[in-house]
Amino acid sequence: MPIVDLVPGHCDALLRFFEALPEGDRTFIKEEVTDPSTVRSWAAGEDGVRRWLSMDGGDVCGYVALYRLPGWSDHVGEIRLVVAPGRRGGGLGRELARHAVVQGLGSGLAKLVVEVVAEQGAALALFTGLGFSGEALLRDHIRDRSGQLRDLMVLAHHVGETWSGMATVGVAEDLDRPEG
């Protein structure tokens, strides 16, 4: 499935995607993703965040965003990833996350971070498989919609170090080529 930039024409499909997510999944998304004005502002590019979708026909199957942090952390980007439940486990999340990593490298970011609820084993495996490692465990850091406190893990990828290592062995140019 192609990965495309989020544009205004995708707003309705993206809203349907977020509305179809189980309530438990939406608990761990920072933004109010079912608010049409939020999604429209994203598509208009008003906040400077880069966002991409994986589309199957007119339906969104996955979403990834790359937020450049402000101020003294402007060398750091935060990745936020959501994949439709029916599309999980097939490599789509990895493809989207990898796309964000490559775009982060291309925009000059030196470090990427992702926040993952500690119980989300598949997400932890996905990001560690892409070179991320644990930097922090924040105990009882988030509260789900039922009021239960959950641990949050912060994973980081020092992309500059990784990129220079890949360039040394000649595989950097293969990073964004489709596998097959």
List PLM regions with ranges.
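Conserved GNAT acetyl-CoA-binding A-motif
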Residues: G104-V116
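Conserved catalytic-core motifs of GNAT/GCN5-like acyltransferases
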Residues: V113-V116, T128-R150
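Acetyl-CoA-dependent GNAT
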Residues: P8, A20-L21, T27-G86, A97, ...
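A short beta-loop-alpha structural element at the N-terminal edge
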Residues: M1-R16
